[in-house]
Curated annotation (Swiss-Prot):
One of its GO terms (biological process) is translation. One of its GO terms (molecular function) is structural constituent of ribosome. HAMAP family: Ribosomal_uL30_B (MF_01371_B). Belongs to the universal ribosomal protein uL30 family. The keyword Ribonucleoprotein applies. The lineage of its organism: Bacteria, Bacillati, Actinomycetota, Actinomycetes, Mycobacteriales. NCBIfam families: rpmD_bact (TIGR01308). It holds the Pfam family Ribosomal_L30. This is Large ribosomal subunit protein uL30. GO terms for cellular component: cytosolic large ribosomal subunit. Part of the 50S ribosomal subunit.
Amino acid sequence: MALKITQVKGTIGTKPKHRDNLRSLGLKRIRHSVVRPDTPEVRGMVQAVRHLIVVEEVAGE
């Protein structure tokens, strides 16, 4: 199982830690999507920035 993560809000006015989490996930701009494996580390980063992203579960790695 994998997670498709899409950034839906910008980073202006957000905390530096949230910007770092988005960058670590590979997100750079609004409506940019990445697919990441469903691991506890990725889930933790997703939880921290859940107000800036949309997450979908997809089949595959």
